[in-house]
Structures are given as structure tokens and as C-alpha cells.
């Protein structure tokens, strides 16, 4: 049964990677993904990168299936019975860095773990989610994003959206900046109940939901005019993305702690970014509205 579970998830991840890459390429209309197939003693994967497109400056869509003899601390802190236990981890990770500052950055991750505890019993779970990081916020976009997120969760329970939204808000909060990375979405981990079929079905819904949630926003904003002011703000805000990924993100930490393939792990980084000492947006400016209207955690749709 364990082999069947693994085969089903691997097929899903690979197929979802194809669908998402085709959708990005179609919308961009200029650049195509370059594929890097890799294979090491610790696993294998398929890294796909789109660069210097018409709409997207860079997009990474990664599939991987890795193995290890000792589950890294980033995944075992809450699973004491799995410390120093062997594991397998497979999944897909997507990060888009648009060229146009009015198009938000997006992130999707779905992962499946198999591990054997100290009693040699096989333990499995799913994790993942998606979140949105705008530079210039639009209420229409945020409400659309969270409406899709709630729609995904509805068949699995009335409280699921609000549970995973809060988890996302908490997870993507940059403590050293005292601000959110973006406007959130969904985040879940350790999902193994009520059974494999239900947990897998929810994880598949996350993949489809990302497509339904993100690409309509891209199509709506990709033709907006922008200049150096918007570009500079975009590069500055990308700095927050880098800070979170390198300091706080469990996926990045897992890859580093497991001595994973660093090129693939860091492919989520934006190609260009900037920091400015002591910079603050002018009051009542379009840039300031990101901080006052969109980054504060709130319920975007009614309970």
C-alpha cells in the first residue's frame, strides 16, 4: 500500500508541474521553461526555470523526490518519534517573480512525506499551501484569491479555510520586520486524517486552486503601465521575500539541512532585489497602502 501511495503522489506532482508550466508559458507568450533533470545519491528531480519573459522575470517550478537516513530538524521538531529516522519526501514547489510590479508574486508548495518511526512503522503526511505577495494591492484580487481558497476548503469542512488561513498568516509573518510577507492564503502540514484518499484529494485541490486563483489576477494586471518608481518598490519588497526564505522558510531549511541540491533549493530567489537603509514609503502614497491596507492580517471574506 505504501508503494501505491508513493506512485500516486509522484504521478500527480509530475503532471501538475506540466500543467502549471504550460499555463505560465501560455500567459507569458515569450519565454519557455528550460528543464534541468538531475539525479543524485539522495534523490532526483526536474527543475524548470522560465527567465526574462514578457510577463515574468523568473518562474521556478520544481519537482523532487529525495531520500534520507535522518529526518531534518525542520521536519521533525514536532515529531519526536521520527527523530533520526529514515524518510522519503516528494513534492512540487512554484515561485513566480513577475516583471510588472502590479502583478503579485505567488508561491505554491505541495509535499508528501513517508518516514519509518523507531518501531519501523511507516508514517505518512501531506503539507503545503499557497500564498500571494502583492507589491501594489487590489481589493478585487485579494478577495478573489481568498474566495478560491475558501471554495477549495469547503468540501472538507466549514472550519478548514479559517484554520489553514490562520496557519498561513502565522507562518508567513516576518517577525524581525513585524509584518506579513503578503496577504496570505492557505498553509497546512501533518495532514494524514481522516485517511489517505481524503488528504490526497485536498492536496490535489490545492494544486488546481492555485491555477484558478493566480492566473486570472495575472491576466488582469499584466498590461498595467509602470515605471522606475514601481520597479524600485518591487525590488525593495522582494528583499522581504528573500529574508523570509533564507531565515524562516521550513522548505528552504529542510533542503539545506538535508544537503539537498542547492541550485534547485535557491531557485525560488528573485533574480534582482535591493535593500535600502531606513526607507519608508511616503504617507498616503500608493506604496504606503500596501502597509496600511493589505499587509495587516484580517479576514478578507465573511465567516
Curated annotation (Swiss-Prot):
The record marks 176 as: Important for dimerization. Pathway: Porphyrin-containing compound metabolism; protoporphyrin-IX biosynthesis; protoporphyrinogen-IX from coproporphyrinogen-III (O2 route): step 1/1. Disulfide bonds: none annotated. Belongs to the aerobic coproporphyrinogen-III oxidase family. The keyword Transmembrane helix does not apply. GO terms for molecular function: coproporphyrinogen oxidase activity; metal ion binding; protein homodimerization activity. Residues 241-276 are annotated as: Important for dimerization. It is found in: Cytoplasm. It comes from the Bacteria. Keywords: Cytoplasm, Heme biosynthesis, Metal-binding, Oxidoreductase, Porphyrin biosynthesis. InterPro entries: Coprogen_oxidase_aer (IPR001260), Coprogen_oxidase_aer_sf (IPR036406), Coprogen_oxidase_CS (IPR018375). The active site is at residue 107. It catalyses: coproporphyrinogen III + O2 + 2 H(+) = protoporphyrinogen IX + 2 CO2 + 2 H2O. Its main location: cytoplasm. GO terms for biological process: protoporphyrinogen IX biosynthetic process. A divalent metal cation binds at residues 97, 107, 146, 176. Homodimer. Its cofactor is a divalent metal cation. This is Oxygen-dependent coproporphyrinogen-III oxidase. Its EC number is 1.3.3.3. The keyword Nucleotide-binding does not apply. GO terms for cellular component: cytoplasm. Involved in the heme biosynthesis. Catalyzes the aerobic oxidative decarboxylation of propionate groups of rings A and B of coproporphyrinogen-III to yield the vinyl groups in protoporphyrinogen-IX. Coiled coil: none annotated.
